[in-house]
Amino acid sequence: MTEKPISLSDYQQKVDDWIKEYGVRYFSELTNTAILMEEVGELARLMARKYGDQSFKKGENEASQLADEMADVLWVLTCLANQTGVNLEEAVKANFEKKTTRDASRHKNNPKL
């Protein structure tokens, strides 16, 4: 049986429930911002090794790391959204509309693309 995809709102709630049950409380917003930067750095390191010019170090294994690092970034970003009262589902919809309006022909008319 396959699980039903999870909405951003449901994900935000699941993260909040997990924090309250297992994490005791959220770290401060500043601490979570620093943790987010750390997680983005880990993702960047993996991207540089997998798609860039760096090679993996002896003993490093890239299998499934990319998805895990992206999920770590999403987790901490969701914690910050929960802490600051941002509804990610609404924010993503509004951001998509903004980009569509602003960039309706911008990329199509870009000779570099």
Q: What kind of region is each of these model predictions?
A:
Residues 1-70, 74-113:
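Flexible "arm" and connector segments at domain edges
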